Amino acid sequence: MQFSKDMVAAFARPAILCLLRQGESYGYEIIQKVKELSNGEIQWTDGMLYPILHRLEEEELIQSRWGESETGRKRKYYSLTKHSTPAIDQYRMQWTTLNEFLAPLWATQKP
């Protein structure tokens, strides 16, 4: 399924933060988790993900460190900061409100 840029921009930030709540991760792993959790319906690219990771890091919602993979390759690992919990809570409230607004509209929509 193709998502518009606006839709991706709206849900990518809270999705990344929620995924990082499960523990630190690197870019390719985040892309794979999104694909897996969406049963392949959502497929992010490096070009979409990394600018968002950089913005989240600039806003101090995430932090990064360089590490090595099991094969010795360098990877940049991302994790949450102390500032991320309030942001996640705010995103949750916003998405809940939007869902509560849209759910009855979807239900009453005529074909």
Predicted regions and their residues:
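N-terminal helix-turn-helix DNA-binding core of bacterial DNA-binding proteins
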Residues: 3-48
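Short, solvent-exposed loop/turn elements at beta->coil junctions and helix N-caps
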Residues: 4, 67-68
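Short, hydrophobic-biased segments on the C-terminal half of alpha helices
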Residues: 50-55
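Glycine-centered, phosphate/nucleic-acid-interacting loop/turn motifs that mediate DNA/RNA or nucleotide
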Residues: 60
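Short beta-strand "wing" residues that participate in macromolecule-binding interfaces
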Residues: 64
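Basic, amphipathic "hinge/linker" alpha-helix immediately C-terminal to the N-terminal HTH DNA-binding motif
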Residues: 70-92
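Amphipathic alpha-helical dimerization/coiled-coil segments
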Residues: 86-111
